[in-house]
Amino acid sequence: VLGPARILTQPSINPSFHASLNSEPYIVRSTYLTPGLLVLLISGIVVLPVLQHFDQEWTVWLHEQGSHKLGIWMGRTMFEGKLPGASDPPVLFLLASFILYFRSWSSQASQGLIRWRPFLGFIVTTALAGSLGAVHSLKWVIGRARPYEVWGQNWPFSEWYEFGPHFINEGIYRGSFPSGHSAVILSLLTLSYIWFNGGSNRPRARSLAISWGVIVIILTVMMGIGRAISASHWLTDSLGMILPTWAVLHLLFFHLLKLPVQLEYLRSSPSLTDLPRFWELKFCGLCLPILLGMMFIIFGFRSVRFQETPWLLSMVLIGVLLVSFFWPRMKSFYSQVFQIIHGNPETENVRTK
């Protein structure tokens, strides 16, 4: 997985596939792609600074006035030997998606499961890149103290964009920003994208997608409130990250994994046998050392900021080497996969620039 990307054989593609890329449904989806992403990004950038002004005041109020039973239920999980909590159903959903994803690549997989393979790959990539990769990397490099540490243990308060007092050697869950519980709940939004863009133009499917999306956002807000009640997170850790996390999910669906293009390819090649097995996992595996390299770079500059361990500045060099080594390999593998999907290497090279 982490070696140089192999050369993939170019398959024969049904000519109707290229014509389908210019069909009206695909053009409509592409037309609203960039504005949708911009709306999410701009809204997220606006909401975070606005919420920042009320971060401490509202978190204190929720902790004092809110239902502590709600806070306990939102935070606990049966995976830590406790009673089931609010985050358990999304975690079980992600685990089931992983199992079905591996099953969909089996030679005995049914056609129905094979048709779901692009969607399962999207869910798996979202879980690895968003709920795990982005969330925990930010926790480790930001190191923000949680409310109960600031109020009861005299840890210094820091804003969401500032380096906090925690370091990764204190534990992988010590950082407050962003909220992993909220990110897990928001991963259920993948189903809305699947139902809305799954190739069915039925109003019922799209109404279901919109309704489910509203429910997921409400559940995520409730999770953020519950985590503030239990003094485990500031509001900016959870509510402030809804739109940025949603933007990452949107980016994965349309820009990076290009699900509409994959669905058109699926119609022309129903078995999907031309694609490398578990290619989404391999892609995530190549992105992991790049993410680690970026973290090393930030850790290095963070050591200069605190001036306690200046020798950690050497991590910048390690990070640069990791990014420099794995970035071209990741890009090469990604391009080769979509050369197969598009069936035209020159076209894919133009589209990925």
Residue ranges and their predicted role:
Residues 7-30, 107-117, 201-207, 260-281, ...:
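Membrane-interfacial, low-structure loops and terminal tails that flank and connect transmembrane helices
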Residues 18-98, 139-146, 154-157, 168-169, ...:
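N-terminal transmembrane-helix/juxtamembrane module of multi-pass inner/ER membrane proteins
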Residues 37-44, 121-130, 287-289, 313-322:
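Hydrophobic alpha-helical membrane-interfacial segments at the cytosolic entry of transmembrane helices
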Residues 42, 125-130, 134, 188, ...:
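Hydrophobic faces of alpha-helical transmembrane segments in multi-pass integral membrane proteins
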Residues 62, 105-110, 141-146, 150, ...:
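Membrane-interfacial segments
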Residues 85-101, 181-192:
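Hydrophobic alpha-helical transmembrane segments
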Residues 103-140, 206-213:
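Interfacial segments of alpha-helical transmembrane regions
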Residues 161-314, 319, 325-332:
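Membrane-embedded catalytic cores of phosphoryl/pyrophosphoryl-handling enzymes
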